[in-house]
Swiss-Prot record:
The keyword ATP-binding does not apply. The gene is cbiT. GO terms for molecular function: cobalt-precorrin-6B C5-methyltransferase activity; protein methyltransferase activity. Belongs to the methyltransferase superfamily. Archaeal-type CbiT family. This is Probable cobalt-precorrin-6B C(15)-methyltransferase (decarboxylating). Keywords: Cobalamin biosynthesis, Methyltransferase, S-adenosyl-L-methionine, Transferase.
Length: 196
């Protein structure tokens, strides 16, 4: 299956999933991908790829000649990402690696686009490494859910003097209940965009 549209936001249900493997939801994914300012034929590194939704959509957007390097420490996430890459026809330009991101990042080909989809307490070190590797003009986007991760990221970016933007995104999806439509909220997400 390939995605026939030129816009991001493939419906969540189109992706292969596995219990315990996180997925960036369609609406958040569309915003994060727009913040990355992807380039045709470009390269992206996706840290903490989970089900590979960001990786797959980035590979589709950047098209032929592009490369996406997806990293996750969870072997199941790596397996699911590979399956989603094959399902959407981007397996030839999406390389998936299992391991610790801080160890793998310096070994990958350089990129000026990084997506940090996890990181927890390592988020400041991931930002630092990505900023160093991205070089001038690089864009690093992270999505975080917890206030603790947000604080860690903002403290690092402020202390490092890095230009950044932040947006809190709150999405509610409509669903039918007893003949009525109600809105069911997704978790609020903070999208942080840092510029190297």
């Amino acid at each position: 299956m390939s995605w026939p549209y030129a816009t991001p936001g493939i419906p969540d249900e189109e992706f292969i999933r596995a219990e315990g493997v996180p997925m960036t939801k369609a609406e958040i994914r569309a915003l994060a991908l727009s913040k990355l300012r992807l380039i045709k034929g470009g390269t992206l590194v996706d840290v903490g790829c989970g089900t590979g939704t960001i990786s797959v959509e980035a590979a589709l957007i950047m098209g032929e000649g592009s490369k996406v390097y997806a990293i996750d420490k969870d072997p199941l996430a790596v397996e699911i990402t590979k399956k989603n890459a094959a399902k959407f026809g981007v397996g030839d330009r999406l390389i998936v690696a299992e391991g610790d991101a801080l160890e793998l990042l310096p070994k990958l080909p350089r990129s000026n686009r990084y997506f940090l989809g996890g990181g927890g307490r390592e988020l400041p070190m991931l930002f630092q490494t990505a900023l160093e590797l991205a070089g001038t003009g690089g864009v690093i986007v992270a999505d975080v859910i917890t206030l603790e991760s947000l604080r860690l990221a903002l403290d690092f970016l402020e202390n490092a003097g890095v230009k950044y933007e932040i947006a809190q995104v709150y999405i509610a999806r409509g669903r039918r209940l007893g003949g009525y439509t109600i809105l069911s909220p997704l978790n609020p997400v903070y999208i942080i965009t840092a510029y190297a």
